[in-house]
Amino acid sequence: MLIVGLTGGIATGKSTVSKLLQEKYHLPIIDADILARKAVEPGTRAFNRILSTFGEDLALHDEKTGKVIGFDRPALGRRVFGDEVARKKLNRIVHPAVRWLMVKAVMWEWLVMGRGLVVLDIPLLFESGLDQFCGISVVVATGEEVQLQRLLERDKHLSEQDARGRIASQWGINEKRKLADVVIENDSTREELEKRVDQVVQKYFVRSRLWTWMLRMPPVGLLFALFIFIRRRLTRKRRDKVS
Protein backbone atom coordinates (compact mmCIF):
# COMPACT_ATOMS: atom_id res chain seq x y z
CA MET A 1 0.00 0.00 0.00
CA LEU A 2 1.18 3.51 -0.84
CA ILE A 3 0.70 5.84 2.13
CA VAL A 4 0.70 9.50 1.10
CA GLY A 5 1.29 12.09 3.81
CA LEU A 6 -0.43 15.40 3.04
CA THR A 7 0.42 18.52 5.01
CA GLY A 8 0.92 22.26 4.74
CA GLY A 9 0.91 25.42 6.80
CA ILE A 10 -2.01 27.32 8.23
CA ALA A 11 -4.04 28.88 5.37
CA THR A 12 -1.90 27.39 2.59
CA GLY A 13 -4.75 25.33 1.11
CA LYS A 14 -4.13 21.83 2.46
CA SER A 15 -7.81 21.28 3.20
CA THR A 16 -8.72 22.34 -0.34
CA VAL A 17 -6.28 19.82 -1.81
CA SER A 18 -7.53 17.11 0.55
CA LYS A 19 -11.11 17.75 -0.56
CA LEU A 20 -10.05 17.63 -4.23
CA LEU A 21 -8.30 14.29 -3.78
CA GLN A 22 -11.37 12.85 -2.10
CA GLU A 23 -14.14 14.26 -4.30
CA LYS A 24 -12.51 14.44 -7.74
CA TYR A 25 -10.16 11.45 -7.57
CA HIS A 26 -12.11 9.37 -5.03
CA LEU A 27 -9.02 8.73 -2.91
CA PRO A 28 -9.51 7.61 0.71
CA ILE A 29 -8.58 10.38 3.14
CA ILE A 30 -7.70 9.74 6.77
CA ASP A 31 -8.06 13.09 8.56
CA ALA A 32 -5.86 13.41 11.64
CA ASP A 33 -8.02 16.21 13.06
CA ILE A 34 -11.11 13.98 12.99
CA LEU A 35 -9.18 11.13 14.60
CA ALA A 36 -7.84 13.50 17.27
CA ARG A 37 -11.39 14.37 18.29
CA LYS A 38 -12.43 10.73 18.20
CA ALA A 39 -9.46 9.69 20.33
CA VAL A 40 -10.64 11.81 23.26
CA GLU A 41 -14.36 11.09 23.15
CA PRO A 42 -16.04 10.35 26.51
CA GLY A 43 -15.34 6.83 27.67
CA THR A 44 -12.02 6.47 25.89
CA ARG A 45 -8.82 5.83 27.82
CA ALA A 46 -7.34 9.13 26.61
CA PHE A 47 -10.42 11.06 27.79
CA ASN A 48 -10.23 9.52 31.26
CA ARG A 49 -6.49 10.20 31.49
CA ILE A 50 -6.99 13.85 30.54
CA LEU A 51 -9.47 14.31 33.39
CA SER A 52 -7.33 12.45 35.92
CA THR A 53 -4.21 14.40 34.88
CA PHE A 54 -5.55 17.92 34.41
CA GLY A 55 -8.60 17.93 36.65
CA GLU A 56 -12.02 16.29 36.89
CA ASP A 57 -13.57 19.77 36.82
CA LEU A 58 -12.83 19.89 33.08
CA ALA A 59 -15.68 17.43 32.46
CA LEU A 60 -18.79 18.77 30.76
CA HIS A 61 -22.16 17.29 31.73
CA ASP A 62 -25.53 17.12 30.03
CA GLU A 63 -27.85 19.49 31.90
CA LYS A 64 -30.77 17.06 31.89
CA THR A 65 -29.14 13.69 32.44
CA GLY A 66 -25.90 14.69 34.13
CA LYS A 67 -24.04 12.39 31.75
CA VAL A 68 -20.46 13.34 30.85
CA ILE A 69 -20.51 14.58 27.25
CA GLY A 70 -16.99 15.93 26.83
CA PHE A 71 -14.42 18.22 28.39
CA ASP A 72 -13.84 21.97 28.38
CA ARG A 73 -11.26 22.36 25.61
CA PRO A 74 -10.64 26.10 26.13
CA ALA A 75 -10.04 25.50 29.84
CA LEU A 76 -7.64 22.65 29.06
CA GLY A 77 -5.86 24.90 26.59
CA ARG A 78 -5.37 27.54 29.28
CA ARG A 79 -3.92 24.96 31.66
CA VAL A 80 -1.27 23.79 29.22
CA PHE A 81 -0.57 27.15 27.55
CA GLY A 82 2.95 28.29 28.34
CA ASP A 83 3.62 25.18 30.43
CA GLU A 84 5.97 22.92 28.50
CA VAL A 85 5.73 20.10 31.03
CA ALA A 86 1.92 20.11 30.92
CA ARG A 87 1.92 20.28 27.13
CA LYS A 88 4.18 17.24 26.90
CA LYS A 89 1.94 15.35 29.31
CA LEU A 90 -1.07 16.10 27.13
CA ASN A 91 0.78 15.04 23.99
CA ARG A 92 1.81 11.76 25.62
CA ILE A 93 -1.86 11.06 26.28
CA VAL A 94 -3.33 12.13 22.94
CA HIS A 95 -0.70 11.30 20.33
CA PRO A 96 -0.48 7.52 20.93
CA ALA A 97 -4.28 7.28 20.86
CA VAL A 98 -4.46 9.16 17.56
CA ARG A 99 -1.69 7.04 16.03
CA TRP A 100 -3.47 3.83 17.00
CA LEU A 101 -6.69 5.04 15.35
CA MET A 102 -4.64 5.99 12.30
CA VAL A 103 -3.09 2.52 12.08
CA LYS A 104 -6.53 0.92 12.34
CA ALA A 105 -7.90 3.23 9.64
CA VAL A 106 -5.02 2.39 7.28
CA MET A 107 -5.44 -1.33 7.91
CA TRP A 108 -9.18 -1.04 7.23
CA GLU A 109 -8.59 0.65 3.87
CA TRP A 110 -5.94 -1.90 2.91
CA LEU A 111 -7.23 -5.23 4.21
CA VAL A 112 -11.01 -4.69 4.17
CA MET A 113 -11.58 -2.15 1.41
CA GLY A 114 -8.72 -3.44 -0.77
CA ARG A 115 -7.21 -0.01 -1.37
CA GLY A 116 -3.73 0.30 -2.79
CA LEU A 117 -3.34 3.92 -1.70
CA VAL A 118 -4.45 6.07 1.22
CA VAL A 119 -3.88 9.75 2.00
CA LEU A 120 -3.06 10.81 5.56
CA ASP A 121 -4.17 14.43 6.05
CA ILE A 122 -1.94 15.53 8.93
CA PRO A 123 -1.30 19.22 9.76
CA LEU A 124 1.79 18.33 11.84
CA LEU A 125 3.12 15.57 9.59
CA PHE A 126 6.80 16.45 9.98
CA GLU A 127 6.56 17.79 13.52
CA SER A 128 5.06 14.49 14.70
CA GLY A 129 7.55 12.35 12.77
CA LEU A 130 4.73 10.52 10.97
CA ASP A 131 6.28 11.37 7.60
CA GLN A 132 8.72 8.52 8.30
CA PHE A 133 5.90 6.04 7.69
CA CYS A 134 4.76 7.58 4.39
CA GLY A 135 5.88 6.49 0.95
CA ILE A 136 5.39 10.03 -0.36
CA SER A 137 5.11 13.28 1.59
CA VAL A 138 3.23 16.16 -0.06
CA VAL A 139 3.28 19.77 1.12
CA VAL A 140 0.80 22.43 -0.01
CA ALA A 141 2.75 25.69 0.13
CA THR A 142 2.46 29.41 -0.53
CA GLY A 143 4.64 32.44 -0.11
CA GLU A 144 4.66 33.83 3.43
CA GLU A 145 2.82 37.04 2.55
CA VAL A 146 0.17 35.15 0.58
CA GLN A 147 -0.25 32.86 3.57
CA LEU A 148 -0.71 35.86 5.88
CA GLN A 149 -3.27 37.55 3.63
CA ARG A 150 -5.30 34.36 3.23
CA LEU A 151 -5.33 33.79 6.98
CA LEU A 152 -6.55 37.36 7.58
CA GLU A 153 -9.26 36.93 4.94
CA ARG A 154 -10.36 33.59 6.40
CA ASP A 155 -10.27 34.57 10.08
CA LYS A 156 -11.41 38.18 10.00
CA HIS A 157 -11.40 38.48 13.79
CA LEU A 158 -7.60 38.14 13.85
CA SER A 159 -5.30 41.14 13.94
CA GLU A 160 -2.21 41.04 11.74
CA GLN A 161 -0.07 40.53 14.84
CA ASP A 162 -2.19 37.57 15.98
CA ALA A 163 -2.11 36.08 12.48
CA ARG A 164 1.67 36.33 12.31
CA GLY A 165 1.84 34.74 15.74
CA ARG A 166 -0.23 31.76 14.60
CA ILE A 167 1.95 31.28 11.55
CA ALA A 168 5.11 31.55 13.66
CA SER A 169 3.80 28.92 16.10
CA GLN A 170 4.19 26.26 13.40
CA TRP A 171 7.21 25.11 11.45
CA GLY A 172 7.95 27.51 8.62
CA ILE A 173 6.57 26.51 5.23
CA ASN A 174 10.06 26.70 3.70
CA GLU A 175 11.28 24.16 6.25
CA LYS A 176 8.47 21.82 5.23
CA ARG A 177 9.33 22.36 1.56
CA LYS A 178 12.83 21.01 2.20
CA LEU A 179 11.53 17.83 3.84
CA ALA A 180 8.75 17.08 1.35
CA ASP A 181 8.99 14.72 -1.61
CA VAL A 182 6.40 16.75 -3.51
CA VAL A 183 5.49 20.44 -3.19
CA ILE A 184 2.21 21.79 -4.55
CA GLU A 185 2.49 25.56 -4.85
CA ASN A 186 -0.81 27.30 -4.13
CA ASP A 187 0.03 30.93 -4.81
CA SER A 188 -2.28 31.50 -7.77
CA THR A 189 -5.90 30.73 -8.70
CA ARG A 190 -8.11 27.77 -7.80
CA GLU A 191 -7.95 26.61 -11.43
CA GLU A 192 -4.15 26.62 -11.36
CA LEU A 193 -4.17 24.69 -8.09
CA GLU A 194 -6.42 22.03 -9.61
CA LYS A 195 -4.02 21.66 -12.55
CA ARG A 196 -1.07 21.19 -10.21
CA VAL A 197 -2.95 18.65 -8.12
CA ASP A 198 -3.87 16.73 -11.27
CA GLN A 199 -0.22 16.66 -12.34
CA VAL A 200 0.80 15.23 -8.97
CA VAL A 201 -1.97 12.61 -9.05
CA GLN A 202 -1.06 11.48 -12.55
CA LYS A 203 2.67 11.36 -11.87
CA TYR A 204 2.82 9.88 -8.39
CA PHE A 205 -0.52 8.20 -7.66
CA VAL A 206 -1.75 6.81 -10.99
CA ARG A 207 1.29 6.21 -13.15
CA SER A 208 3.62 4.91 -10.45
CA ARG A 209 4.54 1.50 -11.89
CA LEU A 210 6.97 0.96 -9.03
CA TRP A 211 4.25 1.03 -6.40
CA THR A 212 1.90 -1.09 -8.51
CA TRP A 213 4.63 -3.69 -8.91
CA MET A 214 5.43 -3.68 -5.20
CA LEU A 215 1.77 -4.14 -4.27
CA ARG A 216 1.92 -7.47 -6.11
CA MET A 217 5.09 -8.49 -4.26
CA PRO A 218 4.61 -7.76 -0.52
CA PRO A 219 8.16 -8.76 0.55
CA VAL A 220 9.65 -6.25 -1.90
CA GLY A 221 7.14 -3.65 -0.76
CA LEU A 222 8.10 -4.18 2.87
CA LEU A 223 11.79 -3.83 2.07
CA PHE A 224 11.15 -0.63 0.15
CA ALA A 225 9.04 0.70 3.02
CA LEU A 226 11.94 -0.04 5.39
CA PHE A 227 14.28 1.82 3.04
CA ILE A 228 11.96 4.85 3.02
CA PHE A 229 11.72 4.78 6.82
CA ILE A 230 15.51 4.65 7.30
CA ARG A 231 16.07 7.39 4.72
CA ARG A 232 13.62 9.71 6.45
CA ARG A 233 15.15 8.97 9.85
CA LEU A 234 18.61 9.89 8.55
CA THR A 235 17.26 13.06 6.92
CA ARG A 236 15.61 14.07 10.19
CA LYS A 237 18.82 13.43 12.17
CA ARG A 238 20.83 15.59 9.76
CA ARG A 239 18.23 18.33 10.08
CA ASP A 240 18.30 18.17 13.87
CA LYS A 241 22.10 18.48 13.89
CA VAL A 242 21.98 21.55 11.65
CA SER A 243 19.27 23.21 13.73
Where would I find each of the regions flagged by the language model?
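Short beta-strand-centered segment that lines the nucleotide-binding/catalytic pocket of NTP-utilizing
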Residues: L27-V40
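Hydrophobic anchor at the beta1->P-loop junction of P-loop NTPases
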Residues: V4-L6
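Small-molecule kinase domains that catalyze NTP-dependent phosphoryl transfer to phosphate-bearing small molecules
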Residues: M102, Q132, R154-L234
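ATP-dependent small-molecule kinase phosphotransfer cores
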Residues: R37-G116
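Walker A/P-loop
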Residues: S15
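ATP-dependent NMP and nucleoside kinases share a basic, alpha-helical "lid"
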Residues: W100-E153
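ATP-binding Walker
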Residues: T12
